[in-house]
């Protein structure tokens, strides 16, 4: 018989840097989950990733105080900013441009995000990434 689910917890945690301090500790503690067990498992799974890259994670909490978690790919905005070499997007995205990325960089981001995007094919995923970049004030060349 399947375990009874008592809730889902959605967090964004830097890769390899999960620790019991907020936001991880309070979110897991109020469900009665073992915080250190999660931190060790998360840090072990994110070992190969770039340290500090924010990773969305969905934790499923069960009634017997056990849990499972699913990691998603890093947010598209973070990957776009990294590719463009900027700290933050434009305050006025359609008038002030803050950086540029190429179509090849957009394709690379789309491939990394492909599991989380609902696009039918790679070209549609690239257009989705390009739209996100434009809304941040970053120009996409070759599109």
From Swiss-Prot:
Classification via Gene3D superfamilies: Ribosomal protein L11, C-terminal domain, Ribosomal protein L11/L12, N-terminal domain
Keywords from the named record: Methylation, Ribonucleoprotein, Ribosomal protein, RNA-binding, rRNA-binding
Biological process terms in GO annotation: translation
PROSITE patterns: RIBOSOMAL_L11 (PS00359)
Entries under SUPFAM superfamilies matching the protein: Ribosomal L11/L12e N-terminal domain, Ribosomal protein L11, C-terminal domain
Single GO MF descriptor: large ribosomal subunit rRNA binding
PTM summary: One or more lysine residues are methylated.
One Pfam family, short name: Ribosomal_L11_N
Gene Ontology CC terms, in alphabetical order: cytosolic large ribosomal subunit
Function recorded in the entry: Forms part of the ribosomal stalk which helps the ribosome interact with GTP-bound translation factors.
Family named by the database record: Belongs to the universal ribosomal protein uL11 family.
Quaternary organization: Part of the ribosomal stalk of the 50S ribosomal subunit. Interacts with L10 and the large rRNA to form the base of the stalk. L10 forms an elongated spine to which L12 dimers bind in a sequential fashion forming a multimeric L10(L12)X complex.
Protein's UniProt name: Large ribosomal subunit protein uL11
């Amino acid at each position: 018989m399947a375990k009874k689910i008592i809730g889902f917890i959605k967090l964004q945690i830097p890769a390899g840097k999960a620790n019991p301090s907020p936001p991880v500790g309070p979110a897991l503690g109020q469900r009665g989950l073992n915080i250190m067990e999660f931190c060790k498992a998360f840090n072990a799974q994110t070992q190969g990733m770039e340290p500090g890259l924010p990773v969305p994670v969905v934790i499923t909490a069960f009634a017997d105080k056990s849990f499972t978690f699913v990691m998603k790919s890093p947010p598209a905005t973070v990957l776009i900013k990294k590719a463009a070499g900027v700290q933050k997007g434009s305050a006025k995205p359609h008038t002030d441009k803050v950086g540029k990325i190429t179509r090849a960089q957009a394709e690379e981001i789309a491939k990394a995000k492909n599991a989380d995007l609902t696009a039918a094919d790679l070209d549609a995923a690239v257009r989705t990434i390009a739209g996100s970049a434009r809304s941040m004030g970053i120009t996409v060349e070759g599109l």
